[in-house]
Amino acid sequence: MRVVIQRVTEASVSIRGALHSRIGQGVLILVGIEDRDGESDIELLTSKISNLRIFDDSEGVMNLSVKDINGEALVVSQFTLMGSTRKGNRPSYIKASRPEIAIPLYESFCNSLSAKLGKAVRQGVFGADMQVALVNDGPVTILIDTHNKE
């Protein structure tokens, strides 16, 4: 499972020109799922995301988590995160899970993160053509791949 975490002052998802979800200060999380992902990946990521210290404290040091600041989360599924550019110029998405595998994992991810944050998590719509708008604060952008731990 791969996630891109972006610290934002605001973010939103629109579908066919209509606003679907919006958050204020918090994190926008793009999620890519592959067949070998499971509940252990979800637990690792949602624990890490909810406690990741990427928000400034009163001294201007990144020492606070989204939970500490009572921030919001917007989660968007993005199969293109699983793209491979190893061969040729067109990305291959063969590693991305099919919807019947990915949707339950995506929903579990959102539920787990919501429980850890103690509040509802806003979401995109799985498989929809979405327009994602954000104001990246910093910018701060973190990539985590559960199968390539660093």
Curated annotation (Swiss-Prot):
InterPro entries: Daa-tRNA_deacyls_DTD, DTD-like_sf. Belongs to the DTD family. This is D-aminoacyl-tRNA deacylase. Pfam families: Tyr_Deacylase (PF02580). HAMAP family: Deacylase_Dtd. It comes from Porphyromonas gingivalis (strain ATCC BAA-308 / W83). It is found in: Cytoplasm. It catalyses: glycyl-tRNA(Ala) + H2O = tRNA(Ala) + glycine + H(+); a D-aminoacyl-tRNA + H2O = a tRNA + a D-alpha-amino acid + H(+). A motif (Gly-cisPro motif, important for rejection of L-amino acids) lies at residues 138-139. One of its GO terms (cellular component) is cytoplasm. An aminoacyl-tRNA editing enzyme that deacylates mischarged D-aminoacyl-tRNAs. Also deacylates mischarged glycyl-tRNA(Ala), protecting cells against glycine mischarging by AlaRS. Acts via tRNA-based rather than protein-based catalysis; rejects L-amino acids rather than detecting D-amino acids in the active site. By recycling D-aminoacyl-tRNA to D-amino acids and free tRNA molecules, this enzyme counteracts the toxicity associated with the formation of D-aminoacyl-tRNA entities in vivo and helps enforce protein L-homochirality. A Gly-cisPro motif from one monomer fits into the active site of the other monomer to allow specific chiral rejection of L-amino acids.
